[in-house]
Amino acid sequence: MLYAKALSIGDEIGFFSPSSPATAFAPNRFQRAKAYLKAQGFELVEGSLTGKSDYYRSGSIRERAEELNQLIRDPNVRCIMPTIGGNNSNSLLPYIDYEALRNDPKIIIGYSDVTALLLGIYAQTGLITFYGPALVASFGEYPPLVDETFHSFIDLLCSETNQYQYTMPSSWTDIKHDWETQHSAKPVYPNEWQFIGKGKVTGRIIGGNLNTMAGIWGSRYMPEIKVGDILLIEDSLKGIENVERSFAHLAACGVFERVSAIILGKHELFDNKGTGRTPLDVLIEVLADKNVPIFYGFDSCHTHPMLVTPLGVRGTIDFDNHTFKLEDRWVKAK
């Protein structure tokens, strides 16, 4: 197992665009996100494709891979964060300099389409990666939601402890605003976490964005889901028919027969097609008679605020006391 060093205020965070060109299509939100992290004391290092666009992506496959590799090889960069996800991060996997990352482990964080990179890097190097915020998508949000996301970022990445208990944010949102015309905080909903099961479950946390995992499934970049694992899954902007298909894919692959519990994150702007059903309802139907406990509504997903979750470390869900905590270290001493 490989661990990056914990972050310190003043460290350099490198950002890159592995898929969608957010720095080009959302310049106002991009500038706001940069200003926010700089105001918290971090230095930012721009990736080579900043401000560039090749229609649906920031650059060619090789250009995007080289942008990431430049940050991996920069000894001053201690954390690497995407600007946003998209659909094509998996294209980079054959070209990443894994050896450089083994020699100088860095914090690799992101979510959504970047799941392909998080899991691929973990599978190839053993480096603990982090399901967490992206620069433009997350830190371009307005307070108080962005502050809660940042507090989780600091709690997890600047800490050298080997235990952490998550606290449920009091509110959340998936309300969609035009990024370039948004000028204030979004309305929020009261929060709720649901614990469906009994007793305690401890296992390795693995997973990420459900749709993205399908793009690396069966490859050397997808870590084996082992007996006893805690599966983290979430998705965004999908219809109920696609969610059922994704869950059924996991079932067909025998995943639900191996995992000890499922963490199902909130689904941003879920389209239930008039059924009134939730992703939880769909999951329970697909599970059928499999008695897999579910922690539903965890805020490590596309909604705001976002909680940081290390992948590859041991966690414990207490279904009786409604708690979720980490039981392993996820970074090493500075």
From Swiss-Prot:
GO biological process: proteolysis
EC numbers, comma separated: 3.4.16.-
Protease is among the record's keywords: yes
UniProt-listed SUPFAM superfamilies: Class I glutamine amidotransferase-like (SSF52317), LD-carboxypeptidase A C-terminal domain-like (SSF141986)
Keywords: Carboxypeptidase, Hydrolase, Protease, Serine protease
Pfam families named in the record: Peptidase_S66, Peptidase_S66C
Protein's recorded name: Putative carboxypeptidase VC_A0337
